[in-house]
Amino acid sequence: MKKAIVLSTLCALALSLQASDLGNIEVTSSTINDSEQSLIPEVSTVATLSAEKVESMHIENLQQVLQSIPGVTTESKTGDSIKIHLRGVENQMYMGEKPGVAIVIDGVPVFERTGAVNVDLDNIESIKVIKGGASYLFGDDALSGAVIITTKKGAKYNHNFATAEVGSYGFRKYLARSGYANEDLSFHIQASQRKADGYWEDSDYDSKYLDGKFQYYIDDTSDITFGAEYSQREKDSHGTVGGATEAATNPESVYLGDQESRDYTRMFDVELLKLFLTYSKDFDSNSNLLVNGYVYKDDTQYISSPQTKDATGTTDSTLTDEDYVYDNDYAQIQKGIKSELRSSFDSFATLIGVDLRANTYENEVKYRVNQALITYGPYSVTPNYYLESDFKSSDKTDENVYAIYGEYKQNIIDNLSMTGNIRFDHINLDYNDYKKQHFTNNFNVYSYRIGANYIVTEDTSIYANYSTGFRAPTVSQLYAGDVSAYGSTINNPDLEPEESRNYEIGFRTTQKKINFDLALFQIDRKDFIMKSSGNYGDSDATDMWANIGGAKHRGVELSINGALHEQLLLNIAYTYLDAYYTKYNSFGIDLDANPNTNIVTYFNATGNDIPRTSKHQLNTVIDYMPLDGLQLTGEMNFKSHYYADDLNVIRIPARTIYNAVAKYKYTFGDYALEAFARVDNLFDKTYYATARSSGDRNEDGIFDAEDLSITVDQGRVYRAGLSVKF
């Protein structure tokens, strides 16, 4: 279920009709995950994963469990960091852009610099995925849905727990947790470390977490919860190689002197802190009040831009994979308050919410080495123009969001209910930089959803909905000519927020302990924000960010999960996705085969498939429990071919991967032991984990597979571990 506000026209219609009494009608909070509630009355496609499911898979990153949900695609980064996409939206973007999905952790709408998700995998209580435009609940960037992660809490962690794991390529994990509970309170604290040397050269990482939660029961109807998560993360290269030939001969991305094959960014040092405080109060009138305050800090340092030229502007072949141009220091603070009042009655339910955010983003980029100023048309070089420690950029953006939202749900006739949501966001951007530039912008955006659910039987329902999502322009898009380091892009302060429109109809049922959910969907994106020269396209003239893009994402999703019998569990997730550009008039590539000139050829990409969207995805997981305490799991993950580029020139073949997990639990007295072993890519299949291209990388005048940036999968991987609970 979900939450939002009252669509006045729907309210007037609903209140004028006689509603049948089907028991209390309820709405679901966006601040907490009501994972125990039935999905039968939902008007949108929703999937949930429990802590037991996440823990039973013994995953190294969130991708390994999210692929069991239809419509989810992820891009795995180094370590346990991933970027999540839903229904192919924003799969064409691969830098640090927002993902088009709202990520909410314990009520905190989290955004990290890279658009990725960093969360302690051992502190997850549940994951809820809402598909379709979800800005009616979560505001900015919920173009295709939301992923809601709730961390562990409650009296069930009133024990001690420790685990150790080892695996391929130096993987090690250590964790210790202790908790306590009585009638008045419960708490736990947990410390963990995940580290590995990595398959690829320089792909080592080390993630340390300290987190905990304290819940105090004020009385029988109210409680207060404080949660904290602190992490230090060090990670290096993603293992990128340049071109198909190097992918075949050098999959480990060992630096062999090809300066163009280096990762654009390296040596990340990330410090994260999440704090939240939630007050919850139940009232006798079937109402609940939630107030959630939070602070989220992200301080990220890294190096960027592989160096190819010395201070005179001359190409230097002696430069290595340690030579980079810029030092980057990015710091953000997200602060906010969310409050919701939910009320449930025999025939209708309401929710009213307030979402206030005060976010600050600071970015500082300095030169690591002296560099020349190089201009084209006519070509000229000024040696030592930029000196070590000079600013490349230094800026601060304050983002303030003032939003109200709500939901109204009404029984219309026997077994038929309708839901209406609406949200209003006022967004204020205020930008300042070291050049004394100051820009401000304001956006007012409405988002909404209307849906219906018909309960055929107690275990079967048909649902349909229409919803919207939006994304507001960023300062770097609005004022690119002034704040961007690239002089070819000019300002466009008239940019408007982009909108996605989601249409969905579905059928869900539970038969003999097996859950079925079938959904047909379409997402239309008109006039979305893109550069006039295309996504990462070259340009030989001025360009700008503009509302000029169009795309359509439509398909079918099927989810089947449950118990075939008490010893055999099944999960099937199938997605058919047809995602293509409906408007993409100009994509530029420099194909003149001369590194000192910039002659661009422009192409029309309208009608082409969205890069990195497979038409077919199928994930199947079978759990078999032949003996008490023993569980054997087999997993198959299939993806059909996709294109790595906007022009649909470079086709990446289909692949099928098999994984296996075995675990055994043994209990004696107050002690519970568990041992497990996991093998990923069981048959050691070679394939590209990521593949992308937007230009003639090797400058040979031909756009082909040698222009790809590729991360080759690490192949067969083993992991094993032992845990004890007491």
Predicted regions and their residues:
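Conserved C-terminal beta-signal and adjacent last beta-strands/turns
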Residues: L7, Y216-I218, E229, Y408, ...
